[in-house]
Swiss-Prot record:
Key words of the record: Ribonucleoprotein, Ribosomal protein, RNA-binding, rRNA-binding
NCBIfam families in the cross-refs: rplX_bact (TIGR01079)
Protein name: Large ribosomal subunit protein uL24
InterPro entries according to UniProt: KOW, Rib_uL2_dom2, Ribosomal_uL24, Ribosomal_uL24_CS, Ribosomal_uL24_KOW, Translation_prot_SH3-like_sf
Organism: Stutzerimonas stutzeri (strain A1501) (Pseudomonas stutzeri)
GO molecular function: rRNA binding; structural constituent of ribosome
HAMAP family: Ribosomal_uL24_B
Keyword Ribosomal protein tagged: yes
Function in brief: One of two assembly initiator proteins, it binds directly to the 5'-end of the 23S rRNA, where it nucleates assembly of the 50S subunit. One of the proteins that surrounds the polypeptide exit tunnel on the outside of the subunit.
Amino acid sequence: MQKIRRNDEIIVIAGKDKGKRGKVLKVLADDRLVVGGINLVKRHTKPNPMSGVQGGIVEKEAPLHVSNVAIFNGETNKADRVGFKVEEGKKIRVFKSTQKPVDA
């Protein structure tokens, strides 16, 4: 079970976007995350009339390593860590500081 999943709100704790918050759009297999509006890079694309792609400079999100982000706890308004707890035979993610479920 992953500690950070798609649609989790995270905060960047290291790098050029330190302190920014965003929502996880995609979790990649190599411990990387794509977060909306964070780690934007410019890609130079060629026009492709066959598929209708217009050329130019396009800004898009690049993946961040999972070690550079922390899950954001809305209750405390701070970065938090994730632990696991078994309730009624199901394993759930909980915030370490408040012991409340992440998905609540």
